[in-house]
Structures are given as C-alpha cells and as structure tokens.
C-alpha cells in the first residue's frame, strides 16, 4: 500500500493548509494512505495531541478516509520527520517550501550543496514533493 506523509504545523498555518491540500490530492490520485504528522517541539512546551491535530484538519478538510494522525515529540523537526518517513516506509513526502528551506539549512551543516529532495530520495527511496 502506498503511503503519503505530510508534516504540518499546529495550529494549521496557511502554508500547512496548502501543503496538506496537495498531500490529500496526491493520496487520492495514488489511492494511498495519508499520514498527517505534527512535530511537537520539547522546547516550545506545548502538548499537542493526536485528537487536537485531527480536529484541526477535519475543521479545514472535513472527515478524511485512510488518514492516520501522528504527533511526534522531539528537539528537531527535520529529525522527527525523517524518523517517521523511515519507520513507516513512506513512498511520498509532501513538504512546504518553508520546510524545504529549513531542511536545506540543516543539511548545509553536513553537505556543501544541500539538495533536500536528492538527499531524501537517496537515503529514503521516497518521492519528495515541495509545495
């Protein structure tokens, strides 16, 4: 079964809604399951639950079929996203252009010319869609 993972902010920002809309469309076209992921950063001191995330998404998009809501806790958004993608064997990762910029900055510490899509493709065998 194909799996699409989409990281979003909570509460949903305008960019998160656009990224999520694209992920919902991709999942429908590929007859795929969808994992909506929020990374709850320890340093922000919030305690977002899966129920909170689900309510926020359903308020914007209505009830979605074949969706799993995931809240990971961590210090680095990028690391938590990578963990989710690796653990689930996601086929497609849909990220917003702002998130892609953060990934580039994180990868710049490791690589000379960070190409987020190529980095993820090589290491995860996933398609990366930037919205």
Task: Locate each region found by the language model.
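Gly/Ser-rich helix-loop-strand patches that form or flank binding pockets
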Residues: 91-131
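Short, well-ordered secondary-structure micro-motifs
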Residues: 16-17, 45-49, 79-82, 105-106
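General small-molecule cofactor/ligand-binding pocket signal
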Residues: 35-37, 68-72, 129-131
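Short, structured coil segments at secondary-structure junctions
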Residues: 30, 63-65, 123-125
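Small/aliphatic-rich secondary-structure junction motif
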Residues: 2-47
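Short, surface-exposed acidic-centric catalytic microdomains
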Residues: 42-59
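Charged helix-capping and loop-helix junction motifs
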Residues: 20, 50-54, 108-116
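Mid-chain, well-packed structural core segment of small domains
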Residues: 58-97
């Amino acid at each position: 079964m194909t799996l699409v993972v989409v990281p979003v902010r909570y509460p949903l920002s305008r960019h998160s809604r656009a990224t999520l809309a694209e992920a919902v469309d991709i999942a429908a076209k590929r007859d795929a399951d969808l994992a909506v992921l929020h990374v709850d950063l320890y340093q922000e001191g919030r305690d977002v639950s899966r129920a909170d995330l689900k309510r926020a998404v359903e308020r914007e998009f209505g009830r979605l079929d074949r969706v799993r809501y995931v809240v990971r806790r961590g210090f680095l958004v990028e690391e938590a996203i990578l963990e989710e993608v690796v653990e689930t064997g996601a086929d497609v990762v849909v990220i917003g252009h702002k998130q892609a910029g953060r990934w580039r900055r994180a990868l710049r510490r490791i690589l000379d010319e960070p190409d987020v899509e190529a980095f993820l493709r090589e290491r995860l065998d996933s398609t990366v869609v930037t919205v």
